[in-house]
Every structure is written in C-alpha cells, then in structure tokens.
Regions:
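Post-Walker A helix-loop "phosphate-sensing" segment adjacent to the P-loop in P-loop NTPases
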Residues: 81-89, 113
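Conserved nucleotide-state-sensing and coupling region of NTP-binding domains
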Residues: 94-150
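N-terminal accessory segments
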Residues: 1-58
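Contiguous, well-ordered alpha-helical segments that form the cores/surfaces of helical PPI scaffolds
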Residues: 46-50, 72-84
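Conserved small/polar residues in nucleotide/adenosyl-binding loops
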Residues: 165-171
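Walker A/P-loop
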Residues: 57-77
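Short basic/glycine-enriched coil/helix segment immediately N-terminal to the Walker B
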Residues: 138, 153-165
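Residue-level preference for the first positions of well-ordered beta-strands
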Residues: 59-61, 90-92, 143
Length: 183
C-alpha cells in the first residue's frame, strides 16, 4: 500500500469531503490497498450523483453493464459520503435479491467503521448497538435499511426535508435532496 505523509493525508481527507469522485478513489485505495482502475463512466456517475446531492436532479437512472462499479459508487460509496455530511440521513437500499442489498448495506457500514473513512468524516459514527447488516443506525439516528424487492418496507421511511440555506457545506455545497416517497 502507498504510504502518505500526515500532511498528504490531511489534504486528501479535505478533498475527499468536498469531491465525491475523489472520495470514491481515495476510499478504494485505502480499503483495497491498490489504485482503482477508473474510467470515464465512473466520473460521469459521480458527477450525476453530485447533481442529485445538490438537488439539481430529482431522479436518476444509471444504465451501464454489470461489473462496471455502479453499485460500489452509487450505493456503497454514495451512502457513506452523504452520511459523512449528514449523519442523520436515512437511506433505503432495495435490490432484486435481499442478500445483495444486505451485502451492500454491510459494505457501507464497514466503510463507516474504517480508519480511512474516519479520517475523512471523523464525526460520523455507527451506533454501538447497531450491528445488523441490513438495518443499522448512526450515532445521531441516521439509518440504512436494506431489503430485497419482495422485502417489507412498510414503516421504514427515508429522507429528510431540509432548509437548504441553513445547511450549506463549506459555503459551496448544498444539502442533500431526497427523492419523494412516491418515486
């Protein structure tokens, strides 16, 4: 694995907080131990998700073939990055198979528990009593719930309405905008 100076780590953590694309690459390097072989579509996916985060896009469909990192980027990393900015956010992840949804939720949870993530987002913590893979919470009652398409979602809401002006990030990033529940 690459060794970085403390100054480089601090600079990288700041950049990862601000730039979702850099966050994905930085977390991959620090959790997998080698550089991510990224391609143009990875940047496009990250840019599209940033438009969702900023509230510029209300619905997004990502159509790329299997094994092209869309789940790693749009589910695991995006939930982790958004929870880093708003630890009280609520996410529901549904997949065709409950086992896959649970695995993705677990990967996100493990990312939040990792040292590299805590260097980027030191104030976002998983609750100590939240060890389930498919339904877990942050220390400030944010949550991730995972289910298969035949799973039960009744009673599990996601998203929070926020005042965008009062929750600006570093004066340059607007708050997350959640899809309406009717979507």
């Amino acid at each position: 694995m690459n060794e970085f100076t403390d100054k480089e780590k601090v600079m990288a953590a700041e950049l990862a907080r601000q730039d979702f694309y850099f966050f994905v690459r930085w977390m991959f390097l620090n959790t997998k131990g080698f550089k991510w072989m990224h391609n143009w579509h990875h940047k496009s996916i990250c840019d599209a998700l940033m438009r969702v985060y900023k509230g510029e896009v209300k619905r997004l469909i990502i159509t790329v073939p299997p094994r092209y990192s869309k789940t790693e980027i749009a589910v695991v990393n995006f939930m982790a990055w958004a929870l880093g900015h708003h630890p009280d956010s609520e996410f529901i992840h549904v997949s065709y198979a409950s086992q896959l949804a649970t695995e993705n939720s677990y990967k996100c949870r493990e990312m939040l528990l990792s040292g590299p993530y805590n260097e980027v987002f030191p104030y976002t913590k998983v609750r100590d009593d939240s060890s389930a893979k498919d339904h877990w919470k942050t220390s400030v009652d944010g949550r991730v719930y995972a289910a298969g398409n035949k799973g039960t979602l009744t009673g599990f809401g996601a998203g929070k309405k926020r005042d965008r002006k009062s929750t600006r990030l570093n004066s340059s990033h607007t708050d997350i905008s959640r899809m309406p529940s009717s979507a």
